[in-house]
């Protein structure tokens, strides 16, 4: 069985469908110890409607919903407690006091602590990343800076089934410029009867609209189908045709190996509460390539030249931030896109989640993820035919074209019954109307034995 690369598809032996084989994969998993760094919800707690403390039941659920919300790292409580203790003990001095026994920097530099760790997750220089805001808010800020339509180049290319918030954001920016979204939004979809959008089709749309498109914004991973787009190839080609290129990495952050700097991406934004495990509604992140974040002082210290953006005091250089002279001098890089003083509590939760990523690498996580999702696919398809299965896997089969998630399109009328049966069995995954179950085994805390158990329970639910 090949497990050395993420481009080749693992192959499995004849006994792969046994629980013993799944256990052998767990026994040889170099990342198995990371599961102990998380609080796994118990079966008893997920069935209860009362607020319960973790650990009341010894039997954990099977949590395959990290593509919607990751589970809580054990470090989160420690980091939040440290932040609350800092606030309660020294008050406003927490902005500038580096508390020696705290895992967190002083509040003034806390966003930089998060950005440094996030930069390693997305393959960027620390100066190219900012920890701030939430995903759609950050997309708005980035579009305000990078979408500069003209009379001839005004269209935005996007995927046909973008997450609604992305659709709303793009639509509103087009309307803000007194343009008609029906004319200026170009949706790229799959061919009739399919779900995957071939890279060649995206490139053909870029060619078709090279003269009238200003920008292309795509998801790194399509939230519904789980398709991973060829970020490097699409970025390079779109830029060669004169388009600005942005990426929504909500489902790619913490999931796949990214190299945003090397791929020359113009801008990107992501949330951190899915595979990033930073908590519901957690502080998000954005990327601005270094070539767009430069600040030019050749015309004098009081006349900095920089890329247009919506500005706020927290994006100002820290050396002059408190001078209050109304002369904005942005932090070079993505930090110059910050608007307001970020929540130290939210940053504590984010830094706690990132502390887990600091102990490994995206290359290692991706290696396990490729094997785990391939094993899931192998078990789902074993001893079935296209005609006999009550579901279709609409996620691409090639590892290079997907992340952790597999999207299962069930036959009409099965979704709610199957979802209920899985929940009763203590399995948490995600459903999307009209008939898709999204299953995402996460390499940080899920096991191969859980994959085996899930498939057994799913098949039992379908047989019922």
From Swiss-Prot:
Cofactor: pyridoxal 5'-phosphate
Residues involved in pyridoxal 5'-phosphate binding: 135-136, 163-166, 248, 251, 273, 313, 341
Catalytic activity from the UniProt record: L-kynurenine + H2O = anthranilate + L-alanine + H(+); 3-hydroxy-L-kynurenine + H2O = 3-hydroxyanthranilate + L-alanine + H(+)
Single GO BP term: anthranilate metabolic process
UniProt enzyme class: hydrolase
Localization in the cell: Cytoplasm
The enzyme's E.C. designation: 3.7.1.3
Subunit: Homodimer.
Family: Belongs to the kynureninase family.
Function: Catalyzes the cleavage of L-kynurenine (L-Kyn) and L-3-hydroxykynurenine (L-3OHKyn) into anthranilic acid (AA) and 3-hydroxyanthranilic acid (3-OHAA), respectively.
Name of the protein: Kynureninase 2
Biological source species: Aspergillus clavatus (strain ATCC 1007 / CBS 513.65 / DSM 816 / NCTC 3887 / NRRL 1 / QM 1276 / 107)
Gene: bna5-2
């Amino acid at each position: 069985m090949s497990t050395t690369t993420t481009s080749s598809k693992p192959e499995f032996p004849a006994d792969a469908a046994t629980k013993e084989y799944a256990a052998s994969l767990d026994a040889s998993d170099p990342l198995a110890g990371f599961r102990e760094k998380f609080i796994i919800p118990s079966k008893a707690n997920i069935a209860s409607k009362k607020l319960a403390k973790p650990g009341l039941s010894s039997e954990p659920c099977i949590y395959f919903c990290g593509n919607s919300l990751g589970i809580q790292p054990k470090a989160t409580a420690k980091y939040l407690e440290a932040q609350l203790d800092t606030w309660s003990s020294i008050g406003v001095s927490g902005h500038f006091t580096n508390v020696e026994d705290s895992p967190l920097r002083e509040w003034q530099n806390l966003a930089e602590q998060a950005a440094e760790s996030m930069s390693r997750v997305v393959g960027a220089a620390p100066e190219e990343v900012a920890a701030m805001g939430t995903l759609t808010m950050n997309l708005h800020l980035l579009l305000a800076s990078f979408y500069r339509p003209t009379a001839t180049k005004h269209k935005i290319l996007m995927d046909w089934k973008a997450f609604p918030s992305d659709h709303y954001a793009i639509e509103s920016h087009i309307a803000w410029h007194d343009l008609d979204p029906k004319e200026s939004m170009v949706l790229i979809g799959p061919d009739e009867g399919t779900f995957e959008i071939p890279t060649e089709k995206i490139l053909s749309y870029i060619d078709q609209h090279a003269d009238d498109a200003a920008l292309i914004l795509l998801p790194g991973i399509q939230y519904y189908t789980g398709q991973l787009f060829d970020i490097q190839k699409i970025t390079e080609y779109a830029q060669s045709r004169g388009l600005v290129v942005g990426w929504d990495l909500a489902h790619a952050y913490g999931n796949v190996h990214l190299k945003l700097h090397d791929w020359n991406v113009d801008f990107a934004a992501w949330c951190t509460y899915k595979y990033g495990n930073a908590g519901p509604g957690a502080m998000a992140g954005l990327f601005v390539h270094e070539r767009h974040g430069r600040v030019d002082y050749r015309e004098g210290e009081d006349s900095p030249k920089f890329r247009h953006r919506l500005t706020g005091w927290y994006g100002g250089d820290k050396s002059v931030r408190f001078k209050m002279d109304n002369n904005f001098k942005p932090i070079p890089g993505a930090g110059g896109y910050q608007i307001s003083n970020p929540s130290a509590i939210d940053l504590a939760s984010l830094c706690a989640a990132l502390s887990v990523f600091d102990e490994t690498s995206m290359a290692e996580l991706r290696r396990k993820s490729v094997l785990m999702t391939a094993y899931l696919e192998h078990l789902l398809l074993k001893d079935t035919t296209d005609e006999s299965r009550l579901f279709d896997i609409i996620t691409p089969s090639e590892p290079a074209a997907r992340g952790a998630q597999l999207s299962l399109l069930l036959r009409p009328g099965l979704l709610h019954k199957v979802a209920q049966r899985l929940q009763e069995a203590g399995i948490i995954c995600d459903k999307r109307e009209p008939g898709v179950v999204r299953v995402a085994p996460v390499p940080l805390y899920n096991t191969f034995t859980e994959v085996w158990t899930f498939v057994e329970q799913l098949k039992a639910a379908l047989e019922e």
